[in-house]
Structures are given as C-alpha cells and as structure tokens.
Amino acid sequence: ACPFAAKWRKDGKLRIEVRSDKSKYEKHLTSLLKDWNKKKHDIIIFCDPYYDQYSLEQFQEKIDFYNKTYNRRDVYFMGFHPDNPASVEEQEFLVEPTDDTTYDNPIPYSMMLIQKFKQLYEASCKLHKIGYYKKWPPEYYEEVVATRQKTYEKLFKKGVTS
C-alpha cells in the first residue's frame, strides 16, 4: 500500500490496463510501453487474469527481463502474482497497512506495476526519511527497496550509494 497511490489515482496519473485475451503477454506489455505517455501517466498497472499461462518463476523472469531492458530508460517494473500472495505473518504492513477491511477480489490476476524509475527512487527516499519502512522486515526491505535504490544509483548517480 503505497501512500502516493491515492494521489496518483485522484490526479489521473494512474493508468490501469487489463490483458484482454490469451495472446502473448509480452506483446500486450510491450504495446503498453510503446503507447505510454509519461507526461500524462506516472504509473501503469497491467493486470493479467490469464496468469495461469506462466508460473511464478516465469513471471519473475519477465520482471527481471523488463528491468534489465528498461531501467536505463528510467522505467522500473514490480510484480505481484496470485501464487505468492502477501501473508499477514510475513508482510502485515502490506496486507493490512491501515487496519481497514481488506477487499477480497473474487477474480485472481497477476499485476505488473510500471513506473518512472526516478520518481520511484525519489518517493522511496522520502518514505525512508519519514520512517515508512521501519515496520518492514529487514530482509524484505533489502530485497525490495535497498536493491532497487542501489540499482538506480548505479545507473544514474555515479559514485553515490545509499
């Protein structure tokens, strides 16, 4: 639950797309990327109800491939797969970050979040300063946030480390 998400949605900066058929996943995603107006939308969420066509491992390979290909173009990819849901025990801060009633989606789907890398880096720096990540398990923080921040710094801030 990103604290910036509600503002992006309210400001119309969030684009949500759903894979409409079972044709090749990469074809849909690449088409979205080519069509992305970065001045209009800060983030794209690509939902895929046909996620059963690929395993969790294959999905992670897609994320890694797109990051390797697009990070240098100031684009970062994150994904969520129904076969690896956030659990209360491991990631309570993600499952119920505000203690609100959790909405249970009857139609499972994978989700690829595509965002401007610089914007994500800067937002993450702000969140770090206000203590947002303090409740995160250290291993999860390292895997998700610290690694991403180091990648950005390596690509765009030569000689700077977090």
Name these PLM-found stretches.
Residues A1-S162:
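Expand to "…catalyze enediolate/carbanion chemistry for C-C bond making/breaking, isomerization
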